[in-house]
Amino acid sequence: MFVYDVVNALDYEKARSIITAFISQYVQRAGSRGVVVGISGGVDSTVAAALAVEALGRQRVLGLLMPSLYTPPEDLKDALDVINALGVEWKRVDITPIYDAFVKTLPDFSQENRVAAGNILPRIRMTVLYYYANKYNLLVMGTGDRSELLLGYFTKYGDGGVDFLPIGSLFKLQVRELAARLGFADIAKKPSSPRLWQGHTAEGELGASYEVIDQVLYAVFDLKKPPEEVRGFFGEVVDIVITRVKKNIHKLTPPAYPDITPARRNV
């Protein structure tokens, strides 16, 4: 039972049509042959890849499996099931040797700061994706959703380093609903996890379930409800969410630079 019904706030067929048209037009305008996308076996990459196939055809979508030392076997199985269901070309790049070689070059590397250590993995994946994008004249299609974008729950210049985000307007719960409608009901039920360290789950790190987080985001940012009203239903989670949004807004803006207009000479 939802206080703020974020799941039913969307016309899914219309959203699907808008997103597939967007993918097709964006790729065409870029003069690209298609897209390359990391497929993890999670709900976001599954939905993004499925919509890309619908928009472009399976021949123009390249899927990359990029497991690390923290990737469980069930994720690989799910990713392969998605690839087989969609019929796309794919490649597997095990990034563990790259990660091991990288951290060995850092004189003071430590696992103590697991965020700093964990963020190396998505940045390696970004580099691999852009290698194949450059090689085959493809665009890197990101898989971030609106919940992650608002929260800043992604790695800067990692999974945030992409050319476009087709599901960036959908909340996590809406992505799950769309996944079920696209025929991926089992994946829609999987707990979300970036797999940046052993036992890592998104909801464990965020401190609340997406069932709660998405209602807070939807109420505050779409319905424009005052935080004190939303706090009456969800308590301190509202403050946690709003604080995270404010703290991570820099992830959604270009790098800052000074305005030197006063120093320019009129010549």
From Swiss-Prot:
Q: Where does Mg(2+) bind?
A: D44, E148
Sorted UniProt keywords:
ATP-binding, Ligase, Magnesium, Metal-binding, NAD, Nucleotide-binding
InterPro entries reported for this sequence: NAD/GMP_synthase, NAD_synthase, NH(3)-dep_NAD(+)_synth, Rossmann-like_a/b/a_fold
- Single GO molecular function: NAD+ synthase activity
The chemistry this enzyme catalyses reads: deamido-NAD(+) + NH4(+) + ATP = AMP + diphosphate + NAD(+) + H(+)
Keyword flag Ligase = yes
Tell me its family.
Belongs to the NAD synthetase family.
- What's the protein called, per UniProt? NH(3)-dependent NAD(+) synthetase
What taxonomic lineage is listed for the species of origin?
Archaea, Thermoproteota, Thermoprotei, Thermoproteales, Thermoproteaceae
Tell me the gene name. nadE
